[in-house]
């Protein structure tokens, strides 16, 4: 994160207004403006582990990562700058959480790209902090209001649930495939062999559906799940518990917090980070897998057919197979052999 996003560039047009403010930055924090903007004091709260990694290097303990912000996270702040995400329920979860903690009279700024639906912030906050649009540039809108009433926030009311082939899947706003199993994951699941054994790592686990479905027909696997998203980590833990499946779940930026080697790594890797297209996570996954696979171990991922992963797989593993495909998706398989680069 070095170049500023369009949303941050709009905020910089008003930088003089923030010099005396004690600011809490939250939402879709795609760059390091929270660490660089000239303010009286700055804090940041994010649900994205990779964003926290960048900000904490510059802000220390003033950058926090968690599903739910606490009173300590917003202490002494008189201004909220909220970056609108692409997901409206995610925005509602985060804003209701933050506004329930901030004191009445807090200045509220909401900024985001028009295509993300930032306009709906006005309606969402109408009862708590009526907003007015104060700037429009770089295809973004900047809205300002003042907190008049704190909402009541109950994180439990945001949980969702659905069933897949008799399995219970727990979800939260911001979790991939929140409303049902996506087609890509269905295709990947169709390729998993029953009675598999060994250590399995699910990278970018989302709500945990891949892992619990795999464990149902391969009960002897030992599961580890990770994701950059705090909602995904909590949803996966809840999904495992709901299906009486054991596994370790933690936040990690691809392999950043992963220790040891595995017999199989499975993933439906993301190719968006917020509103931005990004292949970084998937390429990091493929290249880093060789440092976390046992000899003979396997990487199995599903991806949109148009994405350029075959070259990275061949470069890293020496070869790959396509073991299932539809018009839109392909499931790739690569084996850890002597040909594979050792990272």
UniProtKB/Swiss-Prot annotation:
Enzyme kind, highest EC tier: transferase
GN (gene name): rsmC
Positions of disulphide bridges: none
GO terms of molecular function: 16S rRNA (guanine(1207)-N(2))-methyltransferase activity; nucleic acid binding
PANTHER family hit by this protein: RIBOSOMAL RNA SMALL SUBUNIT METHYLTRANSFERASE C
Cross-referenced HAMAP family: 16SrRNA_methyltr_C
Phylogenetic classification of the source organism: Bacteria, Pseudomonadati, Pseudomonadota, Gammaproteobacteria, Enterobacterales
GO cellular component, one term: cytoplasm
Pfam family, one: MTS
Family per record: Belongs to the methyltransferase superfamily. RsmC family.
Cited CDD domains: AdoMet_MTases
Protein name: Ribosomal RNA small subunit methyltransferase C
Its EC number(s): 2.1.1.172
């Amino acid at each position: 994160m070095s170049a500023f996003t369009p949303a941050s560039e709009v905020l910089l047009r008003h930088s003089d207004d923030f010099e005396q403010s004690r600011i809490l930055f939250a939402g879709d924090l795609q760059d390091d403006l929270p660490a660089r903007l000239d303010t009286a004091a700055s804090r940041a709260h994010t649900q994205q582990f990779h964003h926290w990694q960048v900000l904490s290097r510059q802000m220390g303990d003033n950058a926090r990562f968690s599903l739910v912000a606490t009173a300590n996270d917003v202490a002494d702040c008189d201004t909220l700058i909220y970056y609108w995400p692409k997901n409206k329920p995610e925005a509602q979860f985060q804003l209701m959480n933050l506004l329930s903690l901030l004191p009445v009279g807090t200045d509220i700024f909401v900024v985001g790209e028009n295509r993300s639906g930032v306009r709906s912030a006005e309606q969402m906050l109408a009862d708590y902090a009526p907003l007015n649009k104060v700037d429009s540039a770089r295809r973004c809108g900047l809205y300002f209001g003042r907190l008049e009433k704190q909402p009541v926030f109950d994180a439990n009311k945001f949980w969702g649930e659905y069933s897949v082939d008799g399995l219970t899947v727990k979800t939260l706003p911001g979790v991939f495939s929140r409303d049902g199993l996506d087609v890509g994951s269905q295709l990947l699941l169709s390729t998993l062999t029953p009675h598999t054994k060994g250590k399995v790592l699910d990278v970018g686990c989302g709500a945990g559906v891949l892992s619990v479905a795999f464990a149902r027909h391969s009960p002897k696997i030992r599961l580890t799940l990770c994701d950059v998203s705090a909602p995904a980590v909590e949803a996966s833990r809840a999904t495992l518990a709901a299906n009486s499946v054991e596994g370790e779940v933690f936040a990690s930026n691809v392999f950043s917090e992963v220790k040891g080697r595995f017999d199989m790594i499975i993933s439906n890797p993301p190719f968006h980070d917020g509103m931005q297209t990004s292949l970084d996570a998937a390429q990091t996954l493929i290249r880093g897998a060789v440092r976390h696979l046992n000899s003979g171990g396997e990487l199995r991922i599903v991806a949109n057919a148009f994405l350029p992963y075959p070259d990275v797989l061949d470069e890293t593993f020496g070869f790959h197979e396509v073991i299932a495909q539809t018009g839109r998706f392909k499931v790739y398989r690569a084996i850890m052999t002597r040909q594979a680069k050792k990272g």
